[in-house]
């Protein structure tokens, strides 16, 4: 006779693709629970952040009252409102997972900064309401806690300064896992370097820094003398508004571009497995799953010494961003240093300290199960 499995409810209040991949891993990998997944579409961000508790209660009441042993939710959820509207969930122990937080986005306008306040406050209340809070990186946890502290200081009254500490005391860091991908590699000419930039084509990933650094690199005498043939793979999801720098860069480096634009998952992994370097210029990356996947597939990362990158990228592969106006120069210098020195090349490929095996799904699924079991 098979044992009766516990029932787990998983709520994704803003069902982005990365969140889907995360909870698919949970529901496939943790077999001790019978999972029910309920989601809301990933659009109208500010409205979804404000209304999701009510939307869940009105649109999915039958599923929500089916009797659960645990509740697992992404951090967009307005947990306090949901528990008030659906009393059957009020005593179900809840784990909230933060893929990101609303305090550390590089917002472009004062209007957006004002509009994000509701989402920031809701995230504090949700974290306070949860029994357990998980973050995907130390950087994410630290920026959330420090952001909550600043937020509370700015409010007129009614918010205890002890709240961030209370949240931190019931939190832990458990990264989003990657799969153990295996891809065949191809032979190539000895003087060819394949270089990847793969992010969303949006301002917060700073594509203009990458392209400006490339132009500076190509003008450096040491690089010119090396005779290296650098092939570019510029990948990632684009949207209706694409920064102007992409079109200009595609024209300027048309003889070097080997891949341009969004790729299928299979082609994306194949390109990573056959490339040498993966570059980030991101202003914010709460974990950097794409960078971790690229490292796992054999790419050497070059990234800014900020956000989550120092947690898994050795210092010698991070470029300095202490002078923002000089960031593209710092990246160009780092690339030239790595590409043009045989000694450095051999050292960084053989003993750079890169190891992301701890991010593999088979290493992390047991930690997730232990966290859920402990609720």
Which residue ranges define each predicted feature?
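Aromatic "clamp/platform" in nucleotide-sugar-dependent glycosyltransferases that forms part
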Residues: 283
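Donor nucleotide-sugar binding/catalytic pocket of nucleotide-sugar-dependent glycosyltransferases
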Residues: 131-184
């Amino acid at each position: 006779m098979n044992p009766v499995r516990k029932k787990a409810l998983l709520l994704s209040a803003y069902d982005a693709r990365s969140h889907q991949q995360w909870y698919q891993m949970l529901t496939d990998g943790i077999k001790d629970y019978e999972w029910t997944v309920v989601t809301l579409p990933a659009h109208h961000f500010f409205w979804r952040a404000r209304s999701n508790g009510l939307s869940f209660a009105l649109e999915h009441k039958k599923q929500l009252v089916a009797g659960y042993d645990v509740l697992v939710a992404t951090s967009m959820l307005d947990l306090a409102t949901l528990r008030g509207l659906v009393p059957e969930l009020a005593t179900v122990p809840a784990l909230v997972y933060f893929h990101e937080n609303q305090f550390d986005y590089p917002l472009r306008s004062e209007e957006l900064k004002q509009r994000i306040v509701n989402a920031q406050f809701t995230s504090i209340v949700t974290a306070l309401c949860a029994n357990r809070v998980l973050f995907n990186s130390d950087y994410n946890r630290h920026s959330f806690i420090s952001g909550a502290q600043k937020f509370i200081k700015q409010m007129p009254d009614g918010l205890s300064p002890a709240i961030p500490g209370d949240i931190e005391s019931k939190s832990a860091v458990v990264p989003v896992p990657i799969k153990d991908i295996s891809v065949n590699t191809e032979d190539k000419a000895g003087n060819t370097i394949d270089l990847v930039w793969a992010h969303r084509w949006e301002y917060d990933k700073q594509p203009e820094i990458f392209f400006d650094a490339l132009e500076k690199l190509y003008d450096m005498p040491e690089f010119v003398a090396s005779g290296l043939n650098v092939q570019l793979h510029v990948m990632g999801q684009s949207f209706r508004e694409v920064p102007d720098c992409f079109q200009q860069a595609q024209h300027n480096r048309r003889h070097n571009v080997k891949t341009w634009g969004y790729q299928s998952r299979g082609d994306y992994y194949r390109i990573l497995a056959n490339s040498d370097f993966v570059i980030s210029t991101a202003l914010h990356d709460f974990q950097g799953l794409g960078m971790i996947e690229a490292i796992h597939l054999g790419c050497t990362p070059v990234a800014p010494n900020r956000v989550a990158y120092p947690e898994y990228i050795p210092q010698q592969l991070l470029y300095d961003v202490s002078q923002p106006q000089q960031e593209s120069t710092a990246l160009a210098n780092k690339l030239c240093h790595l590409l043009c020195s045989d000694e450095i090349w051999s050292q960084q490929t053989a003993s750079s300290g890169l190891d992301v095996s701890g991010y593999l799904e088979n290493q992390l699924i047991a930690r997730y199960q232990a966290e859920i079991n402990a609720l």
